[in-house]
Amino acid sequence: MAETKIIYHMDEEETPYLVKLPVAPERVTLADFKNVLSNRPVHAYKFFFKSMDQDFGVVKEEIFDDNAKLPCFNGRVVSWLVLAEGAHSDAGSQGTDSHTDLPPPLERTGGIGDSRPPSFHPNVASSRDGMDNETGTESMVSHRRERARRRNRDEAARTNGHPRGDRRRDLGLPPDSASTVLSSELESSSFIDSDEEDNTSRLSSSTEQSTSSRLVRKHKCRRRKQRLRQTDRASSFSSITDSTMSLNIITVTLNMERHHFLGISIVGQSNDRGDGGIYIGSIMKGGAVAADGRIEPGDMLLQVNDVNFENMSNDDAVRVLREIVSQTGPISLTVAKCWDPTPRSYFTIPRADPVRPIDPAAWLSHTAALTGALPRYGTSPCSSAITRTSSSSLTSSVPGAPQLEEAPLTVKSDMSAIVRVMQLPDSGLEIRDRMWLKITIANAVIGADVVDWLYTHVEGFKERREARKYASSMLKHGFLRHTVNKITFSEQCYYVFGDLCSNLASLNLNSGSSGASDQDTLAPLPHPSVPWPLGQGYPYQYPGPPPCFPPAYQDPGFSCGSGSAGSQQSEGSKSSGSTRSSHRTPGREERRATGAGGSGSESDHTVPSGSGSTGWWERPVSQLSRGSSPRSQASAVAPGLPPLHPLTKAYAVVGGPPGGPPVRELAAVPPELTGSRQSFQKAMGNPCEFFVDIM
């Protein structure tokens, strides 16, 4: 009795299923196939079958009519069951990008993202974005699939009556290469498409005719992960040599005897002025171009064999390329290399080699120690150590600053912390300048690489599609940004990282400091008896005055707080909230100043609004002139303290730092700078309250 073997692939399962129908191959229909799958929700699937087209060769054809005859090859039918949610097909050729992302017909070793026009793959966004939706049907199918997977694992499913383990052992294959055995049973034109990350293998088929024609008809070709280019170049030779690597036009001759298909997709550009040339859209794994490795996505195809594409329309170029591929013999491709204005990719450090970050504080302290440079005025020798130890508190004051070495990254970690780790030089994510339609995108990443990185480096993702959903949420929250601001995530697109500095506006130096050891320390102030330098910094500590010098001039009119202006407790009175100064009335101060022989009038003495210890007693500028008598200075000193020695003009000149320019007296400042002079005098009363040196 005649029977038909049907091999069908389900979702993400690495091993296809085999069923036998007691129907002749030329009479089997889709209804017969669905009857065998009665334990599965067939209404939730689309059915694709391996078929032969007269123009394009081997294709995947969608069949939805139950009475339609199934295409048969060598007495067997090859089918793919794709979930209807998120699955779309292009002209009945392939419905690859389903909810579970299977099966990719040919993986590309490199691509240019969405550089192809929208007509090239119209359903790319909708087909990929359907993965973000969870439906009840999907949950039911996932439950059934998991149950079937456990049953297959327990019963050690057989293929054609042979256990998988025995067949692998007989062929000398590793335990995880089950689909490699099946490739010889299906058809000689099949080859294995492996994904090491997901440990899955799927069967795809292609021939010379279908490779070029399928791309001409603008079928979508999925690139799951960017692969390292193969280094096997024994089957090809080229006229280019090491001395001519600077040329941007190369000719590569490919030996088609070893590789059965060319393995490239082409993109044609057109505008109002005509066709703009043929470009390499993507390179497929296992083809002759991928094995050679010198032709890259984005290169312009100039000539194939002896046919020049320069003055040829896109349709004619496609027709010529189809004819040449269908013939036997070597193929010579002349391409213009994609010009990269910043060729970082040729000189980058391998991703596996970590790049150590530089600590600026440690570098500065080390440089200062070697060169013997003295610290700036107002800093202590241990200021660099203070800066180094306080770097953690400064980092913690930035909102959302990650603690990179405290805990591993999980799905519950802050998304901004994960993005910062992704941007590190040794993170393993390939971030570089990329070309898209001859437009340079600086520091861009591919969506598939982002998903793979999240699935590998972030704990908590059970499946890869969960990592993809997380990447989609990163795009929605602004941590990833598309070149043309697309809001839907696609693994084929290029993305740049969003602006992570938006939270710096809320920077607070006091946040994150739990104790005194975490807080930054101010540098030591100059000696209180030394005149404050007038805005000049010197690379040494200012020395204290010799004993022969008189004490520095201190004006009681600018003391804050207590009535004893010259004492050391004025600041303490202010901080303790003393109200002693509130009892001082303007009349008392005026009588005191007038009786001391000052030159001011009663109208010169004003009291600011609000009383209390925090108020400032203003004093007219005229009392600071050189005409002030020694008697006024002596009488202004608080009781119980010795009178100050008069400050002469000569001391004012020599009072500056040694070796520096002479210090100009405040009275010599032009009148139009009165406001600045008064504020400076206030600051000199208690400089610690005005000048804060933040390390």
UniProtKB/Swiss-Prot annotation:
This is Segment polarity protein dishevelled homolog DVL-1. The keyword Phosphoprotein applies. Residues 89-235, 559-641 are annotated as: Disordered. Ubiquitinated; undergoes both 'Lys-48'-linked ubiquitination, leading to its subsequent degradation by the ubiquitin-proteasome pathway, and 'Lys-63'-linked ubiquitination. The interaction with INVS is required for ubiquitination. Deubiquitinated by CYLD, which acts on 'Lys-63'-linked ubiquitin chains. Residues 251-323 form the PDZ domain. Residues 425-499 form the DEP domain. It is found in: Cell membrane; Cytoplasm, Cytosol; Cytoplasmic vesicle. Its main location: membrane. One of its GO terms (molecular function) is beta-catenin binding. Residues 622-635 have a biased composition (Polar residues).
